A protein has these predicted regions:
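Catalytic helix-loop patch of NAD(P)-dependent Rossmann-fold dehydrogenases
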Residues: 76, 83, 87-91, 98, ...
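Adenosine-cofactor binding site in Rossmann-like domains, unifying the SAM/SAH pocket
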Residues: 26-52
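Glycine/Thr-rich phosphate-binding loops of Rossmann-like dinucleotide-binding domains
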Residues: 16, 71-72, 112-114
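Alpha-helical structural signal in soluble globular domains
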Residues: 18, 22-26, 91-99
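Structural signature of beta-strand start/N-cap positions in the alpha/beta core
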Residues: 5, 33, 58-60, 102
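N-terminal Rossmann NAD(P)H-binding glycine-rich loop of SDR-like oxidoreductase domains
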Residues: 4-25
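SDR active-site strand-loop-helix element
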Residues: 9, 37, 62-66, 103-108, ...
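NAD(P)H-binding glycine-rich loop region in Rossmannoid oxidoreductase-like domains
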Residues: 47-84, 97
Length: 125
């Protein structure tokens, strides 16, 4: 992989920081660019902002580690949780799909127990 731009969202979170550290240690940084965005640099819930910022950096791949992580507050702040964990993902996926950009979305393990034999749906509880 040479001369590629990789975008990491949620860059100030635990996983984003770890990815940055691993990137630096991997040797990939010599020939590729890692762009680190957190909420201050990019509001993922704004489709217009996602379009503008991603068009300017034109990443070859996106690693989305951004998430609403206040599990205990998610029910009281359902709109905020939905915006970050669903709308933002849709904005990134829409941009990536239009450009054949690879996207890796990392989700939480706090939602279900993982014992289902079929994919979970929004109606599952």
């Amino acid at each position: 992989m040479n001369n590629k731009t990789i975008l990491v969202t949620g860059a100030r979170g635990q996983l984003g920081k770890t990815l940055e550290h691993c990137w630096s240690a991997s040797g990939l940084a010599a020939d590729n660019e890692l762009v680190l965005y957190d909420i201050e640099e990019l509001d993922l819930t704004s489709s217009a902002e996602v379009q503008k910022q991603l068009n300017s950096i034109n990443p070859h791949a996106i690693v989305n580690t951004a998430a609403y992580t206040a599990v205990d507050q998610a029910e009281q702040e359902a709109n905020a949780a939905l915006a970050v964990n669903a709308t933002a993902v849709a904005n990134l996926a829409g941009w990536a799909t239009d450009r054949a950009c690879r996207i890796v979305h990392i989700s939480t393990d706090f939602v279900f127990d993982g014992k289902s034999n079929t994919p979970y749906t929004p109606e599952d509880s």
